């Protein structure tokens, strides 16, 4: 029997995880694995009508409700929208967060995406995974001890990934797509904002189209794509693929 693992999905804003990997998290949760979800910011710029603190409070609660649908823990790292920078303080803060959560598997954003917060998150999380086991590296905002090892690191697709997206494998999320959709639907504050700012009329329908597009490439109805970090010193065992063998497509 496979031992229970702790999986952390950390992306820039509330709803990014739901769009890009909530189906995979639902499958893992259904197998009894522990799931944590972190947004780097509370989405404080995600409104044209509410002030930053008001919309941030709304979006934190939406993210909690979404996470609860798969019995996951939600936390916010409390950076601010458009203000995530790759620097020493941010790297130490994210390292401290990883030491507190103590995941064995980390899913994070693509290093090449449309939003600067997504790209900065990817770089910071990769650095933090490397730094978290180093006892002489002091984290910021946490006294948690170093991790025993570098976590297995995976990158999700970029938003609206095209034919040129580099992936190692897909996860067939067709069986849990209703859960993925319900998780994203908790972020109801974003419908008007995305329509006004992004030109997206229905964010649920848009997510479904994206997920179906990835599914066609995988030969299934709905899928999510992943790339494992194969850089020196990062774990190379395909642990996520092994946990979800029956759902993996290459």
Predicted regions mapped to residue ranges:
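Active-site rim/loop-helix segments in enzyme catalytic domains that contact anionic ligands
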Residues: 1-101, 227, 239-246
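Metal-dependent de-N-acetylase/amidase catalytic core
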Residues: 2-8, 85-250
């Amino acid at each position: 029997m496979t031992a229970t693992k702790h999986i952390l999905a950390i992306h820039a804003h509330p709803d990014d995880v739901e769009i890009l990997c909530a189906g995979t998290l639902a499958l893992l949760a259904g197998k009894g694995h522990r799931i944590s979800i972190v947004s780097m910011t509370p989405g404080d710029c995600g409104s044209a009508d509410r002030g930053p603190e008001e919309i941030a409070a709304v979006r934190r609660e939406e993210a909690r409700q979404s996470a609860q649908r798969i019995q996951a823990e939600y936390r916010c790292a409390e950076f601010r929208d458009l203000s995530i920078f790759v620097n020493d303080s941010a790297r130490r803060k994210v390292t401290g967060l990883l030491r507190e959560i103590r995941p064995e598997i980390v899913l994070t954003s693509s290093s090449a995406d449309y939003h600067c917060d997504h790209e900065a998150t990817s770089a910071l999380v990769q650095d933090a995974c490397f730094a978290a086991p180093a006892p002489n590296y002091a984290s910021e905002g946490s006294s948690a001890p170093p991790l025993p090892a570098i976590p297995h690191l995976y990158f999700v697709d970029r938003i609206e990934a095209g034919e040129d997206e580099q992936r190692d494998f897909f996860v067939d999320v067709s069986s849990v797509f209703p859960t993925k959709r319900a998780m994203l639907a908790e972020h109801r504050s974003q419908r008007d904002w995305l329509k006004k700012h992004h030109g997206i009329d229905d964010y649920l329908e848009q997510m479904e189209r994206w997920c179906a597009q990835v599914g066609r490439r995988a030969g299934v109805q709905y899928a999510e794509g992943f790339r494992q970090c194969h850089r020196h010193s990062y774990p190379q065992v395909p642990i996520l693929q092994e946990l979800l063998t029956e759902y993996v497509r290459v």
